[in-house]
From Swiss-Prot:
GO molecular function: protein transmembrane transporter activity
Upper lineage: Bacteria, Pseudomonadati, Pseudomonadota, Alphaproteobacteria, Rickettsiales
Subcellular location: Cell membrane
Described function: Part of the twin-arginine translocation (Tat) system that transports large folded proteins containing a characteristic twin-arginine motif in their signal peptide across membranes. TatA could form the protein-conducting channel of the Tat system.
Top-rank taxon: Bacteria
Organism name: Wolbachia sp. subsp. Brugia malayi (strain TRS)
Gene (name only): tatA
Identification of the protein by name: Sec-independent protein translocase protein TatA
């Protein structure tokens, strides 16, 4: 099941109400940093697991 345009619109409205328009750029920036860190940790984890000898 995918999100349709109305569901996305509703989610955006809820986010605006919760965080306010002034704080939204900061929240999105923090979210982007979190996603970037998660991707980096996954990449590092894959490197470590590929360097381990097979058992």
């Amino acid at each position: 099941m995918s999100l349709g345009p109305w569901q996305l619109f509703l989610v955006l409205i809820i986010i605006l109400v919760l965080f306010g328009a002034g704080r939204l750029p900061q929240v999105m920036g923090d979210l982007g940093k979190g996603i970037k860190n998660l991707k980096q940790e996954l990449k590092d984890s894959e490197k470590l697991s590929s360097n381990e000898p097979d058992r």
